[in-house]
């Protein structure tokens, strides 16, 4: 039996869904997870993970980190708003939760802020707890608006949708999202605050 999330994690925490997430992140490290700590902990079974959480979730995330470290898993925790250490073109993979729960314009803005953090060819994986084909279409549209390519949608089980996209080349990122800042040019690949 594979890994699974906590009892009340629903379809996203099911063994088939987490196995699919691990398949899409395989060979990519570090992986940044913006979502619940248990999702970051599950992904950390296969490699180094940084989970970004809201301040109210930090105590739970720190407990997950301690458990992961006891089991020799590389899981780190940072606050999403204050400590977002994502530089431009630095991430091989990014897992986010609940893109389908956002309004269209919010989803487009959020993905437009995240895509430049991916390396060219890096993967963005959105995990959504939904059975709605309309929500799946909205997520795919948000991925298209963020210039992601090779978009795939997978339903590992009923009620769980994964949407996967590949980050564009640096020239497309510059054209779509603007040129790198002076800090990006001076310190390529170094973590820095993302605003």
What are the language-model segments listed below?
Residues 36-82:
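Class I SAM-dependent methyltransferase SAM/SAH-binding core
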Residues 3-30, 38-42:
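Conserved alpha-helix/loop element of class I SAM-dependent methyltransferases that forms part
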Residues 83-96:
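A short acidic, Gly/Pro-enriched loop at the edge of an enzyme's catalytic core
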Residues 131, 135-159:
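Conserved Class I S-adenosyl-L-methionine
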Residues 106-123:
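A short glycine-rich, Lys/Arg-flanked "PGG" loop and its adjoining helix->strand segment in the class I
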Residues 152-195:
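Core SAM-dependent methyltransferase catalytic element
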């Amino acid at each position: 039996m594979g890994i699974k999330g906590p009892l009340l994690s629903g379809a996203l925490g099911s063994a088939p869904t987490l196995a699919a997430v691990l398949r899409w992140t395989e060979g990519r490290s570090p992986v940044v997870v913006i979502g619940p700590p248990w999702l970051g902990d599950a992904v950390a079974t296969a490699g180094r993970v940084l989970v970004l959480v809201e301040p109210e979730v930090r105590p739970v995330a720190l407990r997950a980190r301690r458990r992961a470290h006891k089991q020799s898993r590389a899981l780190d925790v940072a606050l999403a708003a204050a400590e977002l250490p994502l530089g431009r073109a630095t991430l091989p993979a990014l897992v986010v939760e609940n893109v389908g729960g956002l309004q269209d314009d919010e989803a487009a803005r959020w993905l437009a802020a995240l895509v430049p953090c991916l390396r060219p060819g890096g993967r963005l994986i959105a995990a959504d707890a939904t059975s709605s084909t309309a929500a799946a279409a909205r997520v795919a549209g948000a991925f298209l608006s963020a210039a992601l390519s090779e978009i795939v949608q997978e339903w590992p089980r009923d009620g769980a949708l994964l949407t996967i996209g590949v980050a564009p080349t640096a020239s497309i990122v510059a054209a779509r999202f603007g040129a790198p800042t002076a800090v990006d040019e001076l310190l390529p690949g170094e973590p820095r605050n993302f605003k």
